[in-house]
Amino acid sequence: MVVKVGINGFGRIGRIVLRNAIEHGDLEVVAVNDPFIDLDYMVYMFKYDSTHGRFKGSVEVKDGKLYINNKAIAVFGEKDPANIKWGEAGAEYVVESTGVFTTTEKAGVHLKGGAKKVVISAPSADAPMFVCGVNLDAYKPEYQIVSNASCTTNCLAPLAKVIHDNFTIIEGLMTTVHATTATQKTVDGPSHKDWRGGRGAAANIIPSSTGAAKAVGKVIPSLNGKLTGMSFRVPTSDVSVVDLVCRIEKGASYEEIKNVIKKASESPELKGILGYTEDAVVSTDFIGSTESSIFDAQAGIALNANFVKLVSWYDNEYGYSRRVCDLISYIAGVDAKAQ
């Protein structure tokens, strides 16, 4: 079953979701909306990427449409999502990747244009949140607007689930060492809500807040209130790493914990989502990785049998975008069975 998809917002995530959809095979992107990028510029932005390299395929403009690998994609330039003709383009599932329409009410406007479901590629204040490998079984066909959570929650939640299921997390603190994102400044500039966030991205390690750890409690209810965290923004273009420090109820050696994570990474539930490596890796080794979370066995450390630091890498662009595709594929399958 090929699922027909529309993308609203052709920024970092929008473009990389499109790349992943082409690789994924189960999804066909039939429409893209972005009021700030004209068609010729879309071709350029999709073809060339400073982080992920040139697109290995054909990209061209023909008859007012974007053609990728000789397949036509309708292009819209609407500022108001209510005016996007998703239905006419055949897009049933819409990826909301502008970062602007992240509530049920705002993202729900896409339904007016003929979309059946909307997947928000960001955390949402009120939409049901799903993390592949963690809580997809909680999805119900009546949900019209869902959130794919954040890239950091997608990295942390599968790891936390494995640890909690096997050793019971009493409490934990997470730090994500996070690559630069589009909202940051190239040089110092105004950022009234977050003064540190206004400092030059290339010149600084910038402490920042993140709701990613608390959000794990939304997808794993038994961890609600047991995790929180913060972020350091660092001057790299892509790939981030989660550092989870937690107290566990059931004591275990670091070797035992490693073995449990390795076994989980090979299970049908988490294969392709949770990775495992014992290599002496660094961040660029994970550019283009499609897993949500790659556990670094050599980097972690245990103080004793109940207090442990666990380290897991993620391509915050590519891995996250692959999960957006996986989530759409999953919910479309559930929806089809429910009809």
From Swiss-Prot:
It comes from Cryptococcus neoformans var. neoformans serotype D (strain B-3501A) (Filobasidiella neoformans). PROSITE patterns: GAPDH. It comes from the Eukaryota. Its EC number is 1.2.1.12. GO terms for molecular function: glyceraldehyde-3-phosphate dehydrogenase (NAD+) (phosphorylating) activity; NAD binding; NADP binding. Homotetramer. This is Glyceraldehyde-3-phosphate dehydrogenase. The active site is at C151. NCBIfam families: GAPDH-I. GO terms for cellular component: cytosol.
